[in-house]
A protein has these predicted regions:
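Bacterial N-terminal signal peptides
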Residues: 7-15
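Eukaryotic scaffold repeat domains enriched in small/polar residues
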Residues: 22-348
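Positively charged n-region of N-terminal signal peptides that target proteins for export
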Residues: 1-4
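Sec/Tat signal peptide C-region and signal peptidase I cleavage site
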Residues: 17-21
């Protein structure tokens, strides 16, 4: 197990240094990537508005899915030009408090709902194909959150899950998230295989403190945004820890691009806690190779586009066209990257 270096600038010098004397580069040394923003490109139906745009994803046709918290949780589909196509799952029992949406290689749409503790697989047409987890039973009136340690995690029951991904074999990985502090692996039919972490938060490699985002790369390695530990972790396909990425701020969300040469995009949206007073401190996204070498950064905090106000999730199917969902600005942006114009410079 090893720690990932956080800048390509220092790579040559590090190669000659002993492993335990290597000085980790800081974010100030990462080149800036130029980009342009296309805000307000989505066209909801008349009289409809996007709420907290916590989750975005695209399919192979370029259609865009937004899973958002409005008057109630809703899942909208738009075409590549941003025109509204349809709503999926209207009135669905598994929707209460949106957290993540992903699209698999067969264009099935998967939602992760923090409120119902359910992960749902929809067909491209919007038919429910699979459900993982279960909704808690109804209670009368408001109930206080139980004091003391979390209850032991169960194989098929989640506690405020956050994200979902798949390896090339179709195995399913879920970050189970706010209470259980674990990553769970299931086979493609939903049978439990393994887990990393437990209901007790921890800081060691292979332990988590609010695993907030998850993706699987083409090698089958699992990338986890370990939010309250201020890091990203990379696990192998059996959920054994390989390395961690630190010095990129809060591990808020992670996205892995498609294609033969994949990149990781990592969001440092604000200090942990998500308090309004912190929204203007950070807002950048980092682009990295799968070995952890950071190639550049882009973005800044701001209420108006092209600024970010807490990037909760990204789609990076095309590594030069990033779609962001922002929780505090209720906004979805399309970002066109111009990586050939990246210029070295200190972080702002």
């Amino acid at each position: 197990m090893k720690r990932i270096l956080t800048s390509s600038v220092a790579l040559a010098a590090l190669a000659a240094a002993p492993a335990f004397s290597q000085r980790k580069a800081t974010i100030e040394h990462v080149p800036s990537i130029e980009f342009s923003s296309v805000p307000n490109f989505l066209k909801p139906p008349p009289g409809e508005y996007l709420g907290e745009s916590v989750a975005v994803a695209t399919n192979s046709k370029g259609h865009i899915f937004v899973y958002h918290r409005s008057a109630h949780t809703r899942l909208f589909e738009f075409d590549k030009a941003g025109n509204f196509v349809k709503e999926i799952g209207s009135g669905y029992y598994g929707f209460e408090f949106a957290h993540s949406v992903r699209v698999d290689k067969d264009d099935n749409i998967w939602t992760v709902d923090e409120g119902t503790n359910m992960v749902t697989k929809f067909s491209p047409e919007g038919k429910v194909l699979m459900v993982l987890g279960r909704r808690p039973p109804a209670v009368q009136g408001a109930q206080p959150f139980p004091a003391g340690p979390n209850a032991p995690a169960q194989k098929y029951v989640f506690c405020r899950p956050t994200d979902v991904g798949w390896d090339p074999q179709g195995n399913i990985f879920v970050s189970d998230g706010y209470c259980n502090n674990r990553v769970v692996k299931y086979d493609k039919s939903g049978r439990f295989l393994a887990q990393a972490g437990s209901e007790k938060a921890g800081k060691a490699l292979g332990e988590f403190n609010l695993p907030h985002g998850l993706q699987v790369d083409g090698q089958g390695n699992v990338w986890v945004a370990d939010r309250s530990n201020f890091r990203y972790q990379v696990l192998d396909n059996n959920l054994k820890p390989l390395r961690e990425i630190t010095n990129l701020g809060v591990g808020w969300t992670v996205c892995i691009s498609s294609g033969p040469h994949q990149y990781a995009f990592l969001s440092n949206s604000n200090p942990n806690g998500n308090m309004p007073g912190t929204w203007d401190i950070t807002g950048e996204i980092y682009k990295a190779e799968l070995d952890g070498t950071v190639l550049g950064r882009f973005g800044h905090p701001g209420k108006l586009a092209p600024g970010f106000q807490v990037v909760h999730m990204m789609d990076c199917r095309n590594p030069n066209e990033i779609i962001t969902g922002e929780i505090e600005s209720w906004r979805v942006q399309k970002l066109i990257l111009h990586p050939t114009t990246a210029a070295a410079g200190a972080a702002q």
